[in-house]
Amino acid sequence: SCNTATCVTHRLAGLLSRSGGMVKSNFVPTDVGSEAF
């Protein structure tokens, strides 16, 4: 439905954040994880 590069980029980023957000947060937690490792 959207053709502009910006819109496509945002849609891809949204899909990645939704599908890979849980996995990323498990392997790369923000602050607490860096201290734990």
Curated annotation (Swiss-Prot):
Its main location: secreted. GO terms for cellular component: extracellular region. Disulfide bonds join 2-7. The modification Phenylalanine amide is found at residue 37. Belongs to the calcitonin family. One of its GO terms (biological process) is calcitonin gene-related peptide receptor signaling pathway. CGRP1/CALCA is a peptide hormone that induces vasodilation mediated by the CALCRL-RAMP1 receptor complex. Dilates a variety of vessels including the coronary, cerebral and systemic vasculature. Its abundance in the CNS also points toward a neurotransmitter or neuromodulator role. It also elevates platelet cAMP. CGRP1 can also bind and activate CALCR-RAMP1 (AMYR1) receptor complex. It is found in: Secreted. GO terms for molecular function: hormone activity. It comes from Sus scrofa (Pig). Keywords: Amidation, Disulfide bond, Hormone, Secreted. PROSITE patterns: CALCITONIN. This is Calcitonin gene-related peptide 1. Pfam families: Calc_CGRP_IAPP (PF00214).
